[in-house]
Amino acid sequence: MIRSNPHYEKLRSSYLFSDIAKRVAAHQESHPGVDIIRLGIGDVTHALPDACVAAFHRGVDEMANDATFRGYGPEQGYAFLREKIASEDFKARGADIDSDEIFVSDGAKCDTGNFQELFSTDIRIAIPDPVYPVYLDTNVMAGRTGEFKDGRYGGVSYMDCTAENNFVPDLPQEQVDLIYLCFPNNPTGTTITKPELKRWVDYAHEAKALILFDAAYEAFIRDDTLPRSIYEIEGAKEVAVEFRSFSKTAGFTGTRCAYTVVPKACRVFDQKGAAIALHPLWNRRHTTKFNGVSYPVQRAAEAVYSTEGKAQVKALADGYLDNAGIIRRAMDTMGFDCVGGIDSPYVWINGNGRDSWAFFDLLLKKAGVVCTPGTGFGQCGEGYIRISAFNSREKVETAMARMKEALGS
């Protein structure tokens, strides 16, 4: 008989953001016409930059003409985009990444979730807590964890991120093989310094481990001393894979374009302990299971690197950062401790003793504001909420005014 994958039965009942959507829908059904301001899921609200829209149109026009029509493209991405990425995102910052080390995809979520397929199921993973749920859930699906008990899965090295360590995880005390890091961080909005990141790179060399570095929010960094890429750190090319996305950088959440960097110098180890290159493994997986991002979308992504595109993308991110500042200042005024909102579009807020879901429900029902309960990101997120800056200035200001009234501040 056909049997299901038993590891799916270990997963908690549903994905965090599905739970949020259900609660919001139930509230709207019982309160028809209520005005909801969504500051929960990290989805952008402003239109694509004009430079990207124009390039998108040109790409579509090419597809409408037999002479310029394109069918299947290279699975790894068109050279015109890969070369721009290598030049503008890496070489310009002193990171020696070549275009053929870049794999264009339809999302960092897919890539961070899929990359674990390259590794043995008996490796030990190190996951920050709180963390973006996809990292952990995909490893549960693959069978790398034990059962879920007392808020955590067995067989996982959880790296607590709390106020005590400024929400930057400490190095593991035990041997781990695969390490997930995300900076600027989702959900806490915190950043990591170059010396802190260097310690992780050194650890990975010593432990023969691999770092999966999610840099989806690097476009929001304004402090020039902070690393935008792990490859700004000496030795990282041998022990790290990096994930980037145009979703938050240029508003591509509904357009879908991202990329993963797998340096040819990066090594993993076979069952006999011999070092082997990781690049051809991901190339094989990528080309077997993915047929490439559409040509017009890649042309739109290329436009991000034009003179006009750079200015428009920066203005877009600056607007969201201004929103984050409004949120953080408002929460400070209301007496809540918070981090993030600087070099990041997320603000991580201590609920002053409130349960995460209780705080979520209070803001939804009394203020009509949707946030994200911190407990959905892990055990260490209990008592916190995440508020996203991805909305219009007007709605963010309205949301803060409503919250102030609802909380009696």
From Swiss-Prot:
Swiss-Prot/TrEMBL catalytic activity: (2S,6S)-2,6-diaminopimelate + 2-oxoglutarate = (S)-2,3,4,5-tetrahydrodipicolinate + L-glutamate + H2O + H(+)
Q: What is its EC number?
A: 2.6.1.83
Q: Which parts of the sequence bind substrate?
A: Y15, G42, K109, Y132, N186, N291, R386
Annotated residues for binding of pyridoxal 5'-phosphate: Y72, A108, K109, Y132, N186, Y217, S245, F246, S247, R256, N291
In terms of superkingdom, the source organism counts as Bacteria
What GO molecular-function term can you cite, just one? L,L-diaminopimelate aminotransferase activity
Gene Ontology terms describing biological process: lysine biosynthetic process via diaminopimelate
Alphabetical keyword list:
Aminotransferase, Pyridoxal phosphate, Transferase
Which pathway or pathways does this protein act in?
Amino-acid biosynthesis; L-lysine biosynthesis via DAP pathway; LL-2,6-diaminopimelate from (S)-tetrahydrodipicolinate (aminotransferase route): step 1/1
Keyword Lipid metabolism in record: no
Q: Which Pfam family, any one of them, does this sequence belong to?
A: Aminotran_1_2
InterPro entries documented for this protein: Aminotransferase_I/II_large (IPR004839), DapL/ALD1 (IPR019942), PyrdxlP-dep_Trfase (IPR015424), PyrdxlP-dep_Trfase_major (IPR015421), PyrdxlP-dep_Trfase_small (IPR015422)
Q: Note the CDD domains from the entry.
A: AAT_like (cd00609)
List residues, modification N6-(pyridoxal phosphate)lysine. Answer: K248
The subunit structure is:
Homodimer.
Q: What does this protein do?
A: Involved in the synthesis of meso-diaminopimelate (m-DAP or DL-DAP), required for both lysine and peptidoglycan biosynthesis. Catalyzes the direct conversion of tetrahydrodipicolinate to LL-diaminopimelate.
HAMAP family this protein is in?
DapL_aminotrans_1 (MF_01642)
UniProt similarity note: Belongs to the class-I pyridoxal-phosphate-dependent aminotransferase family. LL-diaminopimelate aminotransferase subfamily.
Its name, as the record gives it, is LL-diaminopimelate aminotransferase
